[in-house]
Amino acid sequence: MINHNLKLKIMKNLTLILITLILIVGCQNSPEIVKESWIEKPVSSWPDFALTNEISFTEKTYYDVANSFLVNTGFDTIGVSCKHIFMVFENQLGLNSIDLGSNFNYWKMYPKNHKEKAVTLKRFINKNPNEQIGQFNTLKVRDWIIFEIEGQNNQLYPLKIRYTPVETNEIVYAVGWGMMQKDNNKPALIKLQCFKNLGDYFYIKPLETDTHPAGKSGSPVIDKNGYLVGIVSGQEGNLGVIGGVKYLTTLFDKYDIEYNNSSH
């Protein structure tokens, strides 16, 4: 008959084996996150992914307005900018909904000072003549506009998406041009820290004092591995507001845009 101490020893060993197996299986099922090849290079060597906009209407053409970027869904490339740019159109052109209207001519995205690399937008995917523009406090939860682009442009780099949420205190980076930026040869890289994530958007604290947020709306926000985690939306007091990828995927689902979120 097996004595009591031997039984305890066997049970202990079986427990250790079970825990080890669980850890091994768990590690095997966790996908390895691969850094983008350019992320550890100098910013001057990064591919062109931070863009600005030229938007033409019959009454007016806007040059170098706000920021934008391209996104790799895993199946296609789409153009992205910030919805609150419609507040400008409302004030200056009289638009009253998320629709570019009958006087719209064209929209191009390009790296600042390099219009020869421009991509032209073909279709405004999430336009909605029934969606009121509203004020920023209502726009911040839905501050993404997405576009089908004309053809492919190998001179511009579409960002890959990170689908997991940004965590409190995580460091992320905004990449784009601002109105007060002195050197426009390359977009500015701004280091940010997540203060609180509310799902469709999150609050950040800038970790640099001379950031001048004006004009950076629509800039992509990337994580330490170079993956897209948000879009620069606005400012509330001392905190910045970043539109989260969660709302972007809501748009993908709504408009039947195929995407691959199996990586991370």
Model-derived segments and their meaning:
Residues 43-66, 150-157, 181-264:
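Active-site region of chymotrypsin-like
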Residues 28-30:
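Bacterial signal peptide processing site
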Residues 1-10:
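Short, Lys/Arg-enriched N-terminal segments with co-localized hydrophobic residues
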Residues 12-18:
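Sec-dependent signal peptide recognition
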Residues 65, 72, 80, 90-91, ...:
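Serine endopeptidase catalytic core focused on the charge-relay Asp
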Residues 24-26:
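C-terminal motif of bacterial Sec signal peptides marking the signal peptidase cleavage site
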Residues 36, 40-108, 233-237, 241:
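Catalytic histidine site
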